């Protein structure tokens, strides 16, 4: 459950919790008293469980049928939801599209990492990769970055990132938005082009059978970023893959640094925020990890 202003967005990831949807929604309405509740659940996760959605006896496989299923579960559960919701996070303002955006519309679990970024970017050239709607970019500009370049493969996300820069009345001349594949963009940059690089990609490891494939993806983007950063540069690298442990993530960073001919010193390590408690019997809940590292 994510709360945006007076609205809630919920995701039901498993068939087990799906059975309690009615009771959960009723409890949220009673306790939180939101103006609206919107559901953004992941069809594919339930499909892997062989579950049932919207009374359909089996999952469909054609694109049109899948789109229809998504419409069945991505819908209002209570009240009305506006097209965009304006939120304030640590004094920064953002537009959130809970209907069409990724996941629930915004990545609230990264807010402490965005806050931590501020002390590293004053007067620096910052590259925000997989920038989405510009969360890290807004924080960097507000903290005095000389220039912030946001790179993402989604035109819609970049357009909202630009709106968020304007919403915070930041210097638009210091912000650049580039529609590109991050891996290709990193490959084309020269050493020293940026002082701080943020890597906040989508999950490269979707399930336990693709760990090696996903690790290869993480290594490639981190190695490419490290080749660009000069000595004294800062790498902010994150992973939201539940199947990748923090120890393995740090080892991946070490390997990437070696391949790039760099040395990394971990300055700070973060997981998800205090509102994402972890069950000791459900280690998959430890999905997010993020390291701030000094390059030499």
Language-model regions: role of each:
Residues 2, 20-106:
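Non-catalytic substrate-recognition/targeting regions of SAM-dependent transferases
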Residues 122-132:
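Conserved class I S-adenosyl-L-methionine
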Residues 133-146:
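Conserved SAM-binding loop of SAM-dependent methyltransferases across substrates and taxa
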Residues 147-152:
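Conserved SAM-binding motif I beta-strand of class I
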Residues 156-198:
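S-adenosyl-L-methionine
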Residues 193, 234-296:
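C-terminal catalytic and target-recognition region of SAM-dependent MTase-like enzymes
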Residues 195-224:
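Mobile active-site "lid"/loop adjacent to the S-adenosyl-L-methionine
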Residues 229-231:
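Helix-to-beta-strand junctions that scaffold the AdoMet/dcAdoMet cofactor pocket
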């Amino acid at each position: 459950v994510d709360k945006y202003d007076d609205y809630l967005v919920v995701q039901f990831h498993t068939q087990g919790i799906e059975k309690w949807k009615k009771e959960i929604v009723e409890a949220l309405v009673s306790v939180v008293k939101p103006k609206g509740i919107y559901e953004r659940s992941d069809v594919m996760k339930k499909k892997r469980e062989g579950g049932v959605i919207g009374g359909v006896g089996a999952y469909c496989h054609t694109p049109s049928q899948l789109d229809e299923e998504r419409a069945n579960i991505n819908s209002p559960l209570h009240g009305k939801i506006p097209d965009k919701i304006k939120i304030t996070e640590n004094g920064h303002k953002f537009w959130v599209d809970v209907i069409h955006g990724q996941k629930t519309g915004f990545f609230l679990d990264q807010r402490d990492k965005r806050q931590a970024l501020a002390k590293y970017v004053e007067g620096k050239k910052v590259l925000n990769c997989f920038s989405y709607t510009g969360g890290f970019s807004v924080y960097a500009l507000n903290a005095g970055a000389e220039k912030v370049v946001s790179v993402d493969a989604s035109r819609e996300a970049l357009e909202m990132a630009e709106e968020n820069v304007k919403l915070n009345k930041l210097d638009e001349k210091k912000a650049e938005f580039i529609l590109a594949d991050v891996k290709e963009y990193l490959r084309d940059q020269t050493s020293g082009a940026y002082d701080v690089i943020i890597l906040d990609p989508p999950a490269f490891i979707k399930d336990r059978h693709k760990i090696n494939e996903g690790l290869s993806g993480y290594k490639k983007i981190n190695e490419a970023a490290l080749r660009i950063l000069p000595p004294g540069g800062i790498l902010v690298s994150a992973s939201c893959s539940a199947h990748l442990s923090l120890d393995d993530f740090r080892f991946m960073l070490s390997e990437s640094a070696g391949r790039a001919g760099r040395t990394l010193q971990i300055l700070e390590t973060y997981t998800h925020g205090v509102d994402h408690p972890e069950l000791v019997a459900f280690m998959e809940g430890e999905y997010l990890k993020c390291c701030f590292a000094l390059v030499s």
